[in-house]
């Protein structure tokens, strides 16, 4: 079940649901929810963030991985990740769930 946006925790897990398709186009990607027909475009950094989030056990694990990969202020990365998660969640393009 999806969390309300205000209660997103870095211990939570992000997944792309089965009814959402991701199409990579050179340096960006387009994400489409087949049920709602909503879509969202991501640049190469957003695409990488989503890929790491979707394959990690938690938002925190994805954050740590991306912090090692990119030379960026950690607070900026944390804010950018939360912004991306909130936007994709509002569009119904990801699910956020509590880790057990």
Where do the model's predicted regions map?
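Long, charge-rich, low-complexity alpha-helical segments
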Residues: 38-100
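Acidic, low-complexity/disordered tracts enriched in E/D and polar residues
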Residues: 1-47, 51, 97-100
């Amino acid at each position: 079940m999806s969390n309300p946006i205000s209660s997103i925790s870095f211990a939570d897990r992000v997944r792309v649901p089965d009814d959402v398709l991701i199409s990579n186009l050179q340096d960006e990607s387009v994400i489409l929810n087949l049920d709602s027909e909503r879509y969202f475009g991501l640049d190469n950094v957003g695409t990488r963030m989503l890929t790491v989030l979707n394959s990690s056990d938690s938002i925190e694990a994805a954050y740590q991985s991306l912090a090692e990969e990119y030379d960026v202020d950690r607070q900026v990365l944390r804010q950018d990740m939360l912004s991306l998660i909130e936007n994709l969640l509002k569009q119904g393009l990801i699910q956020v769930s509590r880790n057990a």
